[in-house]
Amino acid sequence: MSEEVGAKRWYAVHTYSGYENKVKKNLEKRVESMNMTEQIFRVVIPEEEETQVKDGKAKTTVKKTFPGYVLVELIMTDESWYVVRNTPGVTGFVGSAGAGSKPNPLLPEEVRFILKQMGLKEKTIDVELEVGEQVRIKSGPFANQVGEVQEIETDKFKLTVLVDMFGRETPVEVEFDQIEKL
């Protein structure tokens, strides 16, 4: 199977059951601390909303579509492979044929199907923001803070906003759906 070297692809990673959220957080922290943002792009836990009606009341819960697995979008290099494999809670890549062999990526149609099930699609967000514009953060720990867009990372669907904290401008990383343009 010939594969483009340096191509951004999706891989399925096996985790301890119930550790998906921890693995996602750990991996995202490792990507930042090890300067791997140019090789490891997104970590997604496949899940979907399920609505059940009990006693006449609808209750919506989020259910993991593939318990024990997370999807990681990355460029497969020795370094990115090492970072993911050695993240606490990760037991290995799916499609790896044995010790030392790199895994096969998921097929694009498989990824599209999974992301569509989650309501994500292969995120193509039309960003009508520019560096220097003022935005309000709608959710998260910095909700209702107003700041200036410092950096836009369309491939990760994140942006860096400078907010005033304790009299200093502090960069805060937020996702596109967490902000609104002023």
From Swiss-Prot:
Q: Does the record carry Mitochondrion as a key word?
A: no
Instruction: Tell me the leader sequence span.
Output: none
Gene Ontology process terms (BP) = DNA-templated transcription termination; regulation of DNA-templated transcription elongation; transcription antitermination; transcription elongation-coupled chromatin remodeling
Taxonomic superkingdom? Bacteria
**Gene3D superfamilies attached here?**
2.30.30.30, NusG, N-terminal domain
Record field: transmembrane: none
Cite the KOW domain residue spans from the record: 131-163
User: Which SUPFAM superfamilies does this UniProt record tie to the protein?
Assistant: N-utilization substance G protein NusG, N-terminal domain, Translation proteins SH3-like domain
Listed PROSITE patterns: NUSG
The UniProt entry's GO CC annotations, sorted and at most eight, read: cytosol
Q: Which InterPro entries match?
A: KOW, NGN, NGN-like_dom, NGN_dom_sf, NusG-like, Rib_uL2_dom2, Transcrpt_antiterm_NusG, Transcrpt_antiterm_NusG_bac_CS
Q: Which UniProt keywords apply?
A: Transcription, Transcription antitermination, Transcription regulation, Transcription termination
Similarity comment: family membership: Belongs to the NusG family.
| UniProt-listed PANTHER family | RHO-INTERACTING TRANSCRIPTION TERMINATION FACTOR NUSG, TRANSCRIPTION TERMINATION_ANTITERMINATION PROTEIN NUSG
What is the protein's known function? Answer: Participates in transcription elongation, termination and antitermination.
List the protein's name: Transcription termination/antitermination protein NusG
Q: Which organism is it from?
A: Staphylococcus aureus (strain NCTC 8325 / PS 47)
